[in-house]
Amino acid sequence: MTKITSDDVRKVATLARLNLPEDLIDTYTSQLEKILGYVAQLEEVDTEDIPPTSRAVEVTNVLREDIIQETDIREDLINLAPNREGDFFRVPKILSE
């Protein structure tokens, strides 16, 4: 594994548009080095016979079948409006011509 340098951290910070304080560069260099070490360990794990997954535990949706039902509440809903004009809701004008 390639060693991470302070210059690498500065370059990544610049690419990510992060303004890192100079006194924290060494801290971030050390932390990034450890993270990449963990990734290197994961690369050593044999996953040849393991199928790709997106979750550790399988999740399934509980779906119901859509059933089309006739309803006759249109007039009731329109009557709930504070102001109506025929089959439409009447609302205050918000745009000028």
From Swiss-Prot:
User: This protein's superkingdom?
Assistant: Bacteria
Recorded catalytic reaction(s): these are: L-glutamyl-tRNA(Gln) + L-glutamine + ATP + H2O = L-glutaminyl-tRNA(Gln) + L-glutamate + ADP + phosphate + H(+); L-aspartyl-tRNA(Asn) + L-glutamine + ATP + H2O = L-asparaginyl-tRNA(Asn) + L-glutamate + ADP + phosphate + 2 H(+)
Q: Name the GO terms of the biological process aspect.
A: glutaminyl-tRNAGln biosynthesis via transamidation; regulation of translational fidelity; translation
One family name in Pfam for this protein: GatC
UniProt xrefs under InterPro entries: Asp/Glu-ADT_sf_sub_c, GatC
> Which GO terms of the molecular function aspect are on file?
asparaginyl-tRNA synthase (glutamine-hydrolyzing) activity; ATP binding; glutaminyl-tRNA synthase (glutamine-hydrolyzing) activity
Keywords from the named record: ATP-binding, Ligase, Nucleotide-binding, Protein biosynthesis
Enzyme Commission (EC) number: 6.3.5.-
- Complex formation: Heterotrimer of A, B and C subunits.
Q: What does this protein do?
A: Allows the formation of correctly charged Asn-tRNA(Asn) or Gln-tRNA(Gln) through the transamidation of misacylated Asp-tRNA(Asn) or Glu-tRNA(Gln) in organisms which lack either or both of asparaginyl-tRNA or glutaminyl-tRNA synthetases. The reaction takes place in the presence of glutamine and ATP through an activated phospho-Asp-tRNA(Asn) or phospho-Glu-tRNA(Gln).
What PANTHER family does the database record attribute to this sequence? GLUTAMYL-TRNA(GLN) AMIDOTRANSFERASE SUBUNIT C, MITOCHONDRIAL
By sequence similarity, the record places it as follows: Belongs to the GatC family.
Mind telling me what this protein is named?
A: Aspartyl/glutamyl-tRNA(Asn/Gln) amidotransferase subunit C
